[in-house]
């Protein structure tokens, strides 16, 4: 939709037109900029069309829907978080997957460490399960383990997450109040959803050229980012993805979207400078 997350109305139309044997096995709901998708409606479609839901919550740690935190998997099968260096909390690199399904949990534990199984209840060779040292590999996987050092770094920051999200929310509220709405389309606020405000994405109005605006802000010392180049525009995927014209929403969004600075220690003086510079354009 216009905010970036998956359009439920568009998805409904696509699912209705899709033949039964071609229905998707899974839908990835991307909570772009930290704003949750409409997970309740998506869950209704999941029950009707029998697909899995994977939440991409790389931006959304600390976000919530009706006071329920993203990652609780109330509407999904899996939820994925990123702990990359620029995320709300970081372990340098890495991330985590949450699920509230026991079967999925045991499968993830197996896949994260070379496919190794140590749980006696899951071992196939039962006569050896009595030995404490015994383990099995029943399928190929890789080493996806986060180190103890990285984990300790992440855990130490979780205590600060509420503060980090609070500061981002204050900055976002100030931007929403002060940036000229006649010149820019600003993010929407929803009663039942709380954004983590990983990004603050604006879209220029009145035929303001986004590239010219980007260059203007750069000259003024304000770093902005274009989020994100559609996957099918990258050379490798151009050959893989056909009928790109059907992905017009991705193209339109990318051509308009511009992320302005938002991070916990962005002080009021810098916020005012960003607002003034934008409004004077």
Segments and roles (model prediction):
Residues 114-130, 174, 178, 212-245, ...:
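Conserved PLP cofactor-binding pocket of PLP-dependent enzymes
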Residues 60, 67-76, 131-138, 189, ...:
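Active-site-adjacent capping/gating segments
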Residues 102, 205-208:
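Helix N-cap motif at beta-to-alpha junctions
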Residues 14, 38-49, 174-178, 216, ...:
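Alpha-helical structural signal in soluble globular domains
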Residues 60-67, 75-199, 232:
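Active-site region of PLP-dependent enzymes
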Residues 3-91, 96-104, 259:
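Active-site phosphate-binding strand-loop segment of PLP-dependent enzymes
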Residues 108, 211-220, 274-279:
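Short amphipathic alpha-helices in soluble, non-transmembrane regions
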Residues 8, 155, 268-275:
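Short, amphipathic alpha-helical "lid/cap" segments that border enzyme active or binding sites
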């Amino acid at each position: 939709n216009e905010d970036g997350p998956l359009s439920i109305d568009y998805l409904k139309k696509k699912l209705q037109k899709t033949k039964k044997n071609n229905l998707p096995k899974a839908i990835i709901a991307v909570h772009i900029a930290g704003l949750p998708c409409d997970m309740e409606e998506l869950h209704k479609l999941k029950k009707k069309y029998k697909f899995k839901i994977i939440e991409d919550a790389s931006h959304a740690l600390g976000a919530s829907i009706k006071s329920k935190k993203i990652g609780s998997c109330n509407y999904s099968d899996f939820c994925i978080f990123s702990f990359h260096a620029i995320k709300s909390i970081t372990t340098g690199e890495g991330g985590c997957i949450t699920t509230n399904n026991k079967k999925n949990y045991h499968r993830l534990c197996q896949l994260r460490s070379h496919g190794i199984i140590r749980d006696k209840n899951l071992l196939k060779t039962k006569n050896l399960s009595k030995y404490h040292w015994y383990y099995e590999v029943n399928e190929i996987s890789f080493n996806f383990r986060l180190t103890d050092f990285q984990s300790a770094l992440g855990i130490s920051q979780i205590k600060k997450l509420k503060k980090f999200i609070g500061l981002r929310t204050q900055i976002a509220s100030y931007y929403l109040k002060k940036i000229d709405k006649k010149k820019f389309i600003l993010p929407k606020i929803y009663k039942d959803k709380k954004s983590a405000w990983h990004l603050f994405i604006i879209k220029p109005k009145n035929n303001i050229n986004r590239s010219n605006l980007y260059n203007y802000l750069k000259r003024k010392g304000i770093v902005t980012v274009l989020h994100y180049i559609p996957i099918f525009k990258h050379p490798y995927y151009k050959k893989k993805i056909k009928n790109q014209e059907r992905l017009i929403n991705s193209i339109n969004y990318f051509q308009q979207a511009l992320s302005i600075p938002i991070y916990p220690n962005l002080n009021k003086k810098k916020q005012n400078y960003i607002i003034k510079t934008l409004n004077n354009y």
